């Protein structure tokens, strides 16, 4: 069961529609894929979608790191040594977390397939299904309401509203959504570092009781300012851009805790193994987990879902990153029904090349 072939390539997946967040408008999506094949014909696949604005990693850096560093570590190695191989990869690809995530996901997929198990059952299943949020970008009120209506019609009831450009317009959108849809929806907010402290206080005061929680309200480097906020705000604030890997998670466990929720993204932390490291810390510290994503192939969305379902600390999913892709290279990976996600019963990630 030795890895005999490693294939690395880049795909332009594109979006069906662009969307705007606090610091950019996104209209294009490129992912780097890794395919591992053993000498007995079993394959494992992984995908990387770097977030340059968050981690500094470009798609070129992702592809280059994998092309240069993967084969010396994995070529000819026995998949039964996958956890040792993951440790080697963690060291070699530490500066390119999306590249590390692609390799990590492929190894996990391959290991679970070798054992004939869905990945979550190899990791230790805790959850069978959970609802995911779906994202509405920054847009005028009329378009916000129309998009919310569309998503409700598709079975989603949890909406993540992007904010952070204009706090008064943000407040108006939240209030109008509540007036229009009331108990039909649950709202979460993602400010993407867009607020100053005074704006956050104002937003919180005007929307209290309407929003379940707010993601990354202040800039990532303003950790001390987050710690000085009232506990009522910190408890419903989720760390995103502030939380890259396990080291960041450990730092945020100390009082006063700046966030009550951690948002784990495989592309920030380096894949399933580092993600579960963060999850274990959060679980011991009674911090709730959300598992999020970039614009990603079903491959890595499935990886995040399997990891999420193996952690007792998981409370929230925000795994809509493949839903607006114009194309993908796989199908399967998960079953989505009325906004609820569950894994398939297929071995590994449960994805199939198209």
From Swiss-Prot:
The keyword Cell membrane does not apply. Mg(2+) binds at residues 190, 215, 240. Substrate binds at residues 135, 160-162, 265, 295, 318-320. Keywords: Isomerase, Magnesium, Metal-binding. InterPro entries: Dipeptide_epimerase, Enolase-like_C_sf, Enolase-like_N, Enolase_C-like, Mandelate_racemase_C, Mandelate_racemase_N_dom. Pfam families: MR_MLE_C, MR_MLE_N. Coiled coil: none annotated. Its cofactor is Mg(2+). Its EC number is 5.1.1.-. Signal peptide: none annotated. One of its GO terms (biological process) is peptide metabolic process. Binds 1 Mg(2+) ion per subunit. One of its GO terms (molecular function) is racemase and epimerase activity, acting on amino acids and derivatives. Catalyzes the epimerization of L-Lys-L-Arg to L-Lys-D-Arg (in vitro). Catalyzes the epimerization of positively charged dipeptides, with a preference for substrates with a basic amino acid in the second position. Has epimerase activity with L-Lys-L-Lys, L-Arg-L-Arg, L-Val-L-Arg, L-Val-L-Lys and L-Ala-L-Arg (in vitro). Part of a large, functionally divergent protein family. Protein modeling and substrate docking was used to predict the substrate specificity, prior to biochemical analysis. Belongs to the mandelate racemase/muconate lactonizing enzyme family. This is L-Lys-D/L-Arg epimerase.
